[in-house]
Amino acid sequence: MDRVLSRADKERLLELLKLPRQLWGDFGRMQQAYKQQSLLLHPDKGGSHALMQELNSLWGTFKTEVYNLRMNLGGTGFQGSPPRTAERGTEESGHSPLHDDYWSFSYGSKYFTREWNDFFRKWDPSYQSPPKTAESSEQPDLFCYEEPLLSPNPSSPTDTPAHTAGRRRNPCVAEPDDSISPDPPRTPVSRKRPRPAGATGGGGGGVHANGGSVFGHPTGGTSTPAHPPPYHSQGGSESMGGSDSSGFAEGSFRSDPRCESENESYSQSCSQSSFNATPPKKAREDPAPSDFPSSLTGYLSHAIYSNKTFPAFLVYSTKEKCKQLYDTIGKFRPEFKCLVHYEEGGMLFFLTMTKHRVSAVKNYCSKLCSVSFLMCKAVTKPMECYQVVTAAPFQLITENKPGLHQFEFTDEPEEQKAVDWIMVADFALENNLDDPLLIMGYYLDFAKEVPSCIKCSKEETRLQIHWKNHRKHAENADLFLNCKAQKTICQQAADGVLASRRLKLVECTRSQLLKERLQQSLLRLKELGSSDALLYLAGVAWYQCLLEDFPQTLFKMLKLLTENVPKRRNILFRGPVNSGKTGLAAALISLLGGKSLNINCPADKLAFELGVAQDQFVVCFEDVKGQIALNKQLQPGMGVANLDNLRDYLDGSVKVNLEKKHSNKRSQLFPPCVCTMNEYLLPQTVWARFHMVLDFTCKPHLAQSLEKCEFLQRERIIQSGDTLALLLIWNFTSDVFDPDIQGLVKEVRDQFASECSYSLFCDILCNVQEGDDPLKDICEYS
């Protein structure tokens, strides 16, 4: 065992197996330790891949070498290496061999033969050891013949015992001597025949207890020798292999005519009886079909790996098996079943009141069709399938009730009303509602009774979405109230609004978008009452006092934002606190449609903040803070630094990636921006991105006018885009506007002119300049 592995490999293997050195060679314990370590070192169990690979390599080498050692070692030590020469006294005395001749007493070795020859001489002095030859000392014969011998011929008691047809080789051992080339044994034709009572010898592959050869008897015996099996006999006087260390004598087999004739007749009788017992089967003339007829393809389910259940099935097998299945299919409680013949086969069509899997039906039928072919499929169209299988070329044999009818498969149509999703989507699109929760709130409110609705009776301006759509959507809202997919319906409607808005941005020019926004504002102004009209005119008067020549300034700003020329499109509002910057920016966002962004946040959160600008006409960077303030009371911030890092966004020359949460990035031109900030110092790189800069100053009379007229603040007239739209139509002629809305502009101007004359508007303007309530001594607003 010390030669199986090198010393380093042996120590490494024992280390991996976690075994002490004294257990080297204990194959059982080593194998058990290998299994335990394999579970610990396997990569799938959390072990090391390298250690597992090393253990497998060493263990495989160890097993291979041990196997080769067992196969190759005999009386000569390792295969291909001559045994050491011992002293003559030791070799002749029959004592133990040298310490390096492993397994020297193994079966068939020279020491094994010597010991047993000495043993037999003690009991039988007449025993003669077989002669030794040069060939017999090379390799032991380990073949053991286990077939029973043929009965001896009683008429020839003096026949010479037959010997083996040569020495058998161990298939696992490579023979070093090529001169030994025994013929392979022939395969026996006949079955085993019983050994006669007179045969006392037997066995093979070594020395027998009686001292005879493998087919012979003891020398002093009186029994006649047995004939060798026919597949060991060789024709003529062909010389066979000689004796070896196992006790086989050199000789040759000679054929016996009687044995040959007896074996030939015995072989023929066995072959004849075997032929009569199992005659060859004829090939089936009509092979089993591979699928259902093509005329039934459209009515069957062709799913193979499906767990879906069905109430109707069609079984295809032989006629006899289908008849048997027709009688035993009651396990599934069929409501209807019929037996059909088709060519050489049959079909069973049945319907059940409960649904079953196809595999369950097929497994049940396969118990009765172990040999016959069987096919089973579910029927998706029972009535149509029944009409086909009961017509030619099919032949209806029997059925448990007179046919199937169409009325058995159709129920009276039940009128089930569902929520009209399209109607909800149209409602959201008409009112520009992109909030799913707001849409759901409106529709749940529409489920109330229209006659008793308080919101509809008041018809307030801020509730016009409700009282304009309540009666129209009341019936659909009742169905929506009991619907389980309310959130899904509202989310789809909101997505439709966003999709329509994005499509409009792609297809329309910015001038067309501005025209549409102005038209919506004019329509809202047209619906105002007299008191509300004066309130909006007060807001127009307040804005005209905010900046010098404010109508022209507003017109330039709208033109700048609409044309959207790269590097000539951004506007900066800079001034002290409470100077009107945020109010004007909010009104622009309301008029044009946009979002307000906060870029004073850290840079890692800026990406999602900028993503809000998707599909917007304009954005507002509100209250941007810088690092260097002209007013020492201002707090520093990161807004200006972030603006400096957004040059591609501010320029509008290239598309930038905008991303929102739970959605993919979208590449588009960043919209123009209106930036409001206090008195901070801007770097030159940021200053160059603004084409128009408006410096605001604090005007106490404007602040006092707002404080004295709380309705301007409560109704957010200053922050409304409708106020700026009214300012445009109040100060410009209709020719300035698009021809499509010139008629609406003239109509709204005439409406407001009828409510407020020019002299009355001048009084409102004077009140604002004096810091009084704009509507003082003009009207009482409540």
Curated annotation (Swiss-Prot):
Q: Where is this region: Disordered?
A: 74-97, 145-291
Q: Where is the composition biased (Gly residues)?
A: 199-209
- Residue positions of the PTM Phosphothreonine? 278
What are the transmembrane regions?
Answer: none
Q: Where does Zn(2+) bind?
A: 453, 456, 466, 470
Major localization class: host cell
Q: Which residues carry this modification: N-acetylmethionine?
A: 1
Where on this chain is LXCXE motif (motif)? Answer: 142-146
The residue numbers the entry assigns to motif Nuclear localization signal are: 279-286
Give a GO cellular-component term: host cell nucleus
SMART domains (alphabetical): DnaJ
Q: Where is the composition biased (Basic and acidic residues)?
A: 85-97
Q: Which reaction does it catalyse?
A: Couples ATP hydrolysis with the unwinding of duplex DNA by translocating in the 3'-5' direction; ATP + H2O = ADP + phosphate + H(+)
Question: Which Gene Ontology terms describe the biological processes this protein takes part in?
Answer: DNA replication; symbiont-mediated perturbation of host cell cycle G1/S transition checkpoint; symbiont-mediated suppression of host innate immune response; symbiont-mediated suppression of host JAK-STAT cascade via inhibition of JAK1 activity; symbiont-mediated suppression of host type I interferon-mediated signaling pathway
GO MF: ATP binding; ATP hydrolysis activity; DNA replication origin binding; helicase activity; zinc ion binding
Modifications the protein undergoes after translation, according to the UniProt entry: Phosphorylated on both serine and threonine residues. Small t antigen inhibits the dephosphorylation by the AC form of PP2A. O-Glycosylated near the C-terminal region.
Q: Which residues bind ATP?
A: 575-582
T-ag D1-type zinc-finger residues: 416-510
Low complexity: compositionally biased ranges:
148-161, 233-247, 264-274
Could you give the cofactor binding note from the entry? Answer: DNA helicase activity requires Mg(2+).
Q: Which residues bind DNA?
A: 293-407
Per its UniProt record, the required cofactor names are: Mg(2+)
Protein's job: Isoform large T antigen is a key early protein essential for both driving viral replication and inducing cellular transformation. Plays a role in viral genome replication by driving entry of quiescent cells into the cell cycle and by autoregulating the synthesis of viral early mRNA. Displays highly oncogenic activities by corrupting the host cellular checkpoint mechanisms that guard cell division and the transcription, replication, and repair of DNA. Participates in the modulation of cellular gene expression preceeding viral DNA replication.
Q: What is known of its domains?
A: The J domain is essential for multiple viral activities, including virion assembly, viral DNA replication, transformation and transcriptional activation. The LXCXE motif specifically binds to host pRB, RBL1, and RBL2.
Output this protein's name: Large T antigen
Taxonomy of origin reads:
Viruses, Monodnaviria, Shotokuvirae, Cossaviricota, Papovaviricetes
